[in-house]
Swiss-Prot record:
This is Putative 2-heptyl-3-hydroxy-4(1H)-quinolone synthase AqdB1. Could be involved in the degradation of the Pseudomonas aeruginosa quorum sensing signal molecule HHQ (2-heptyl-4-quinolone) to anthranilic acid. May catalyze the hydroxylation of HHQ to PQS (2-heptyl-3-hydroxy-4-quinolone). SUPFAM superfamilies: FAD/NAD(P)-binding domain. InterPro entries: FAD-bd (IPR002938), FAD-dep_Monooxygenase_BioMet (IPR050493), FAD/NAD-bd_sf (IPR036188). It is an enzyme of class 1 (oxidoreductase). Induction: Up-regulated by PQS. The keyword Transferase does not apply. Keywords: Monooxygenase, NAD, Oxidoreductase, Plasmid. It catalyses: 2-heptyl-4(1H)-quinolone + NADH + O2 + H(+) = 2-heptyl-3-hydroxy-4(1H)-quinolone + NAD(+) + H2O.
Length: 381
């Protein structure tokens, strides 16, 4: 077999870590993946899977399981506080961009099944205490040496920080609660019941996402200092005041114990010695484009491909970053600036988003990562 192959230790059981583990396993590596929690499971949210993610999942052997019961909407819409349509774009038409939405748990379970199929050893309840560039990984109860360590344990990764890689985190001063609800008749108007819709009102916005015939994903976003809008239970009155047309929907929201801050993270380098860093640990972005998971999969598959082409690990890691960083970093910045548009007053924001929807330059940049075929595989379109 050409290229580098050996033993890899993967830190983190999210989308990036699982994708890297499977991709390496498919290319002849032995792989052990560590998840600090007692089980690998997703938080109660949905996820958008665009062309890039669908192609990656097909290669990883997880596509069919992921798509069971998935939702294929026809349009992405933006509406204002009065329910007026600001912008709309078609998806899932022949020759156009594809996007499906599923519960994140379904995706994670599909990836776990694929990891098992290629022989990845998954160790839960495994706390990694130290990673070094020479390829040593330490745990509460011992250590191991690896030809490659993949760090994919999230934006707050301690393993990454131990490597001394220069990190920059940009706060957006926005936070988000994510919930899943059963879909019920009459919750929303029939004209957009099956569409993907973002509603704006002041500096609050609400993302409406069907995930299946019977499951709905909502994301509620507001400024970090908007105390009247945050907390557990959700202050429903505050959100209904902003979105009165969504009152039947908001009234059904249950506990909201977790409010995540939106951030963008960049690194000077995605690797150090025998360690590769990917996913939110390397290139976190606000979810404005629904590309956090997609970019993690692009990075993971690109890493495995570069390793398969080069006998030298240092050369392979350098080639990997050169190949993947441009499109991912452009996507990060586009997502960052799109999130910042939420700070605009309603009228200027509506005018901006309406004009952007008619701009081919805007559409091309918005869709850059979504339409990127993962390195090393054939386009599925």
């Amino acid at each position: 077999m050409s290229g580098v192959a050996g033993h890899a230790e993967v830190v983190g059981g999210g989308i990036g870590g699982l994708s890297a583990a499977i991709a390496l396993g498919k290319r002849g590596w032995t792989v052990r993946l560590h998840e600090r929690n007692d089980e690998i499971r997703a938080s109660g949210s949905g996820i958008y899977l665009w062309d890039n993610g669908l192609a990656a999942l097909d290669y990883l052997g997880a596509l069919d399981s992921t798509l069971v019961g998935a939702h294929f909407g026809a349009r992405m819409q933006t509406r204002d506080a009065h329910n007026a349509l600001v912008a709309s774009s078609e998806v899932n038409r022949a020759g156009g961009p594809r996007v499906v939405t599923v519960a994140r748990e379904r995706l994670i379970n599909a990836l776990l099944a694929s990891a098992d199929a290629v022989g990845v050893e998954v160790v839960t309840g495994s706390t990694v205490t130290r990673v070094d560039a020479a390829g040593r990984i330490e745990f509460d109860n011992g250590h191991a040496d690896a030809d490659l360590i993949v760090v994919a344990d999230g934006i707050g990764s301690r393993s990454r920080d131990q490597l001394g890689v220069k990190t920059r985190r940009r706060q957006l001063n926005q936070k988000c609660a994510r919930v899943l609800l059963p879909r019920e008749p009459g919750m929303v108007p029939s004209e957009w019941v099956d569409e993907y819709v973002t509603f704006y009102s002041g500096q609050r916005f609400l993302l409406y996402t069907p995930c299946s015939a019977d499951l709905l994903y909502l994301a509620l976003v507001c400024p970090s200092d908007d105390a009247p809008a945050t907390g557990d239970p959700l202050p429903r009155e505050a959100w209904i005041a902003s979105f009165p047309q969504l009152a039947p929907l908001i009234d059904r929201i249950g506990p909201t114990p977790r409010w995540d801050e939106f951030e963008m993270l960049t690194l000077d380098s995605w690797s150090s010695g025998r360690v590769a860093i990917l996913g939110d640990a390397a290139h976190a972005q606000p979810p404005s484009l629904g590309q956090g998971g997609g970019c993690a999969m692009l990075s993971a598959l690109g890493l495995a491909h570069s390793l398969s082409k080069n006998y030298d690990l240092t050369t392979a890691l350098g080639e990997w970053e050169s190949s993947e960083r441009s499109v991912i970093q452009r996507t990060q910045w586009f997502s960052y600036w799109l999130a910042r548009a939420n700070k605009l007053p309603d009228r200027p924001r509506s005018l901006l988003l309406s004009a952007a929807g008619h701009s081919s330059l805007y559409r091309n940049n918005r869709m850059r990562a979504a339409l990127t075929t993962p390195t090393g595989i054939t386009s599925s379109k």
